[in-house]
Amino acid sequence: MEEAILLNQTSLVTYFRLRGLSVNHKARIAMFSMFLIFYVLTLIGNVLIVITIIYDHRLHTPMYFFLSNLSFIDVCHSTVTVPKMLRDVWSEEKLISFDACVTQMFFLHLFACTEIFLLTVMAYDRYVAICKPLQYMIVMNWKVCVLLAVALWTGGTIHSIALTSLTIKLPYCGPDEIDNFFCDVPQVIKLACIDTHVIEILIVSNSGLISVVCFVVLVVSYAVILVSLRQQISKGKRKALSTCAAHLTVVTLFLGHCIFIYSRPSTSLPEDKVVSVFFTAVTPLLNPIIYTLRNEEMKSALNKLVGRKERKEEK
C-alpha cells in the first residue's frame, strides 16, 4: 500500500519550473547575446582544437590525445545546458519535463565527472613526461592512453548513473520550482516529499569526495613537477612550466565549482547561480583560449591549418 502511494506521489510532478536567471526585460537582450556569443565561440574554439590535433601529425602524442578529449567534453558539457538557457531567456514560464530534467542531470554529471578524471590523467601524463622523460613513451604508450580514456569515460558513466538513480527514486508530489537555469541534483532533491538528508550525505560523499580527492592528487602532482623544475631554466623546462600552468588554471576553474557546489549540503546560496554560469558557459570557452595562448605547438598547428585553407580558397 505504501509503495502504491509513493508511486502516485512520484507521478504527480511531470514538469519542473526553472527559476532561471532573474533579469528584467531590458537585460534579456544583452544576456542572450552574451551567452550566445560564449556558446558559439566555445563550439568553434573546441572543435577547431580537435580538428587541428587530428590534422597535424606532430600533435599525435598522449598529451594532445587527452586535450582533444577535453575539448570534446567541453562542447558536450556546454551543449547540455546553454541552448536550453538561451531559449528560456525569452520564456515567461521556464518549463522542463521530468524526463528531460533527468536526462539533463545524467549528461551533466557524465561530462563533468569524466572531465575531472581526465584532468587527473592529464596531470599524471605531465608528471611522467617531465619527471621521467626517458620512460615516457613506455609508460604512456597508446594502449595505455586508450585504456585510460575508456576507464575515465566508464567512471563518469557509473558516477552519473548512481547520482541520477538516487534522484529519480525520490517522490515528487508538490513543489516544482528549481532555483537554477538547469536541472542539477542538489536543487532537484530539495523538491522531494521526504527527508533527503541521507541522500544529501551520499551526494557529498560521491561528487564532493571525487572532486576533493582529484584536486588533491592534481595539486600534489603539479607540486612534484614544480619541485623537479625549480633549478632548471632551459627552454624545454620553460615550455613544460607553461604547459603545467595552463593545466593548473583549467583545473582550478573547473574543480573550484565542483567543490563549491557538491562538497556541502543542498542549501541555496546567492553565489550558486553565478558559479553555475561560470561552470557551464564560461569555463568551456576559456579552456581552448588557455591552451592555445600558452602553447606554441598548438598556435603553430592552428596557423598551419588556417593557412592551408586560405591557399585552397585562393586556388
UniProtKB/Swiss-Prot annotation:
The chain crosses the membrane at residues 34-54, 62-82, 102-122, 144-164, 209-229, 241-261, 273-293. Keywords: Cell membrane, Disulfide bond, G-protein coupled receptor, Glycoprotein, Membrane, Olfaction, Receptor, Sensory transduction, Transducer, Transmembrane, Transmembrane helix. One of its GO terms (biological process) is detection of chemical stimulus involved in sensory perception of smell. The keyword Cell membrane applies. Disulfide bonds join C101-C183. Residues 1-33, 83-101, 165-208, 262-272 are extracellular. Gene3D superfamilies: Rhodopsin 7-helix transmembrane proteins. It is found in: Cell membrane. Glycans are attached at N8. It comes from the Eukaryota. Residues 55-61, 123-143, 230-240, 294-315 are cytoplasmic. InterPro entries: GPCR_Rhodpsn, GPCR_Rhodpsn_7TM, Olfact_rcpt, Olfactory_Receptors. It is a multi-pass membrane protein. One of its GO terms (molecular function) is olfactory receptor activity. Odorant receptor. Belongs to the G-protein coupled receptor 1 family. This is Olfactory receptor 4E1. It comes from Homo sapiens. The lineage of its organism: Eukaryota, Metazoa, Chordata, Craniata, Vertebrata. The gene is OR4E1.
